[in-house]
Amino acid sequence: MALLYYVEMNVDPANPKAPNRDRFVLSKGHAAPALYATLAEKGYFPKEELLNLRKINHMLQGHPDMKHTPGVDMSTGSLGQGISAACGMALAGKIDNADYRVYSILGDGELEEGQVWEAAMFAGFYKLNNLTAFVDFNGLQIDGDITKVLSPLPIPEKFKAFNWNVIEVNGHDLDELHNAIETAKAFTEGPTCIIMHTVKGKGVEEMEGQAGWHGKAPSEEQGVALSLIHISEPTRPY
């Protein structure tokens, strides 16, 4: 999300509803805290508001709410609906001859929802080359291994069958992601799906590859420990 909001997307926190802004839809709405942190850092609302996550009468609900949170382009949570809305936004842009782009992030477990594939068929049929979808492919969902719940595999072949351009990357490598997004922007024949191979809980040893952390917050002690982790990145030209 940081790469999208700080490098790729045409957005203005001072004018969050600008007609020609790029749109972002977090189809895996349960990952809302990551979106909220990005929006706060970008300046859509004060960072102090992050401390009110999921509190009554505050703007940051458990899932993105476009009516209460500045910068949220679509309310999501019911899996599959976000990518469907993103398709509608992309088609509207085509009809209006607008040059904005639409980005959406899905979870791999979310791909078990049939609505996702209706949306994929729709986007491929209408050649929505202004739409880029990302799949967070870590192989885990709240109930465990995705292949043992309701396997959506093979993912690349499914998107290709609906006339999507498919790019696979290491989801923890910003350079690979940046290059993939630039490739998607240059592709004119239809939508692009960027499959990000990731590790759940990457960087935190006791969380890595553990499905149990899907919907569980760290304890106060664990939160303090996490705050001390420093991840350095080399300076990039973009």
How should each PLM-predicted stretch be described?
Residues 1-125:
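Cofactor-binding active-site loop characterized by glycine-rich and histidine/acidic residues
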Residues 196-207:
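SF2 helicase motor core recognition
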Residues 42, 149, 208-212:
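Short secondary-structure boundary/capping segments
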Residues 139-142, 207-216:
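Short beta-alpha connecting loops at secondary-structure transitions
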Residues 71, 75-78, 83-187:
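Thiamine diphosphate
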Residues 213-225:
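Gly/Ser/Thr-rich active-site loops/lids in small-molecule metabolic enzymes
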Residues 229-238:
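Single conserved hydrophobic/aromatic residue that forms the stacking wall/gate
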